[in-house]
Amino acid sequence: MVFKRLLGALGVGGPTVDTVLDPAPARPGGTLTGQVRLQGGNADFEIEHITLELVARVEAEHEGGESEGAVAFERFTVGGGFRLAEGEQREVPFSVTLPWETPITELHGQGLGIVLGVRTELSVAGAKDKGDLDQLNVAPLPAQEAVLEALGGLGFGFRSADLEYGRIGGTGQRLPFYQEIELLPSPRYAQQVNEIELTFLANPGGMEVVLEADKRGGFLSPGHDALTRFNVSHEGVEHQDWPAIVEGWIGQLVEHRASYGPPAGYGSPMGHGSPAAFGQGGHGHGHDGHHHDGHRSGPGMGTAVAAGAAGLAVGVVGGMVAGEVVDEVGDFFEGEEEEEG
């Protein structure tokens, strides 16, 4: 869907702008392509700059609770320096590179409830107007998809996803926010953790995988959080045994046997080396859990996302029907623009 607006800063008779993104979803660190379509007004106008701004709906925690707001996390100048004649139609194609930490919004075409938008700013004769917004769809990188599919195969279920304002200490995070994907524990770990939160922090060479467990308390001990971090390469993803790798990560997280020495293996208790993934000790609060033998296979995370949590209708993600995400983008950012005005 394309959101089309008349340039308010120029009033009636000014040029109009549509930004149309190419239909295929983009990927973190990948190329976003499309066209900015301009329609001339009732006079000639000097188009100084055409700027695209990537904006996300982000949650922030503070003393008063939680609030949501729009955070712009990248800007690109894609055109300008020309005269748009009266009534002229012109297309300005663009190709820009997304930040590596751009959140993913879907898995196998199923929305995760993350709201990202591309907002167009036109600078005309000294006036600027943020005139057009389009929904941005981002699919996972191969390594991200492999981790999610492995978690689904191990019996973990999708609960929700959101963007949190702030930084994760000890990581190479660059954006002012990070994505949290909340997972329901598999039956094997249901007695030990309430949920597991997953964060991907991608970079040109690979990505950091941050796992946090909300661990259940015992009869005499309170519950607490445990955190571990692992590094994964973009190379050789298709040659790895991801269920075994991820199961090793979960074992370290739940048992809290993270090693603070040099990276060894991919994080499993056996410590087998792998060029595509290696475990790295993270931070957490020490508490030994109980390891249960056995392995549960099941549908991949794509199926789990499509089905949603047990008892919820198919397609309901984070309290919002996936098909309504487009409207949510428009409503949310229009509200932000009214506040800015």
Per-segment meaning from a language model:
Residues 153-222:
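Extended serine/threonine-enriched, polar tracts that run as long, contiguous segments within proteins
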Residues 1-12:
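A eukaryote-biased signal for short, well-structured alpha-helical docking elements
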Residues 41-48:
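A short beta-turn/strand-edge loop motif at beta-sheet boundaries
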Residues 123-155:
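Short beta-strand elements
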Residues 287-339:
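Short, low-complexity, glycine-enriched hydrophobic/amphipathic alpha-helices that associate
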Residues 66-108, 128:
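A beta-strand/beta-hairpin structural motif
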Residues 55-68, 216-222:
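Short aromatic-acidic-glycine turn motif
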Residues 53-58, 95-101, 108-127:
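Internal, hydrophobic beta-strand segments that form the core of beta-sheet-rich folds
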